[in-house]
Regions:
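Low-complexity, intrinsically disordered/propeptide-like segments
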Residues: 7, 36, 47, 75-78, ...
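Short acidic/glycine-enriched loop/turn segments that link adjacent beta-strands
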Residues: 38-39, 52
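Acidic, aromatic-enriched beta-alpha/helix-loop junctions
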Residues: 44-81
Length: 113
C-alpha cells in the first residue's frame, strides 16, 4: 500500500500480530493519515495479516472519533470535496499511546495532534 513504508508496515504488522495472539497492547500510533479538505484523520497502529486491514483511531470529522478498523485500500479511494486524496502526514511523530490519543479525542470531539 502506498501509505506505508517498509518500517511502518513491519511495525504495524508486529502490533497486529501481538493483538491477534491475545497480548494486551497499547502501541504508539505508527501512521497518521488525513484529508486536507474534509477534516478526517486516522491514527493507525496495527495492521492485520492481510496487509490491508488497519486498526487505530478514526476521526471522520463528525465529533465522534472512535477506535476501529479500516481498510487501507478503501482509504486509497477516498477524495475530499476538492478532489484531494487521503495523505500521509510526514511530520507525525506519536507522543503518546493509542489509548491516550483516543481518550483525548473523546474529550475534545476530534483528534488534536
Amino acid at each position: 500500500m502506498a501509505f506505508l513504508n517498509e518500517q511502518q508496515r513491519s511495525e504495524m504488522l508486529a502490533n497486529g500480530a501481538a493483538r491477534a495472539r491475545g497480548d494486551i497492547v497499547d502501541p504508539l500510533p505508527v501512521l497518521k493519515l488525513h484529508t486536507l479538505d474534509a477534516h478526517a484523520t486516522w491514527l493507525l497502529a496495527e495492521l492485520a495479516e492481510d496487509g490491508d486491514t488497519a486498526y487505530g483511531l478514526i476521526d471522520l470529522g463528525l465529533g465522534m472519533p472512535e477506535l476501529g478498523h479500516v481498510r487501507l485500500s478503501d482509504l486509497a479511494s477516498i477524495v475530499g470535496p476538492n478532489g484531494i486524496p487521503v495523505r500521509v502526514d510526514p511530520h507525525f511523530k506519536a507522543q503518546r499511546t493509542l489509548s491516550a490519543y483516543a481518550a483525548d479525542a473523546a474529550r475534545d470531539g476530534s483528534i488534536n495532534d
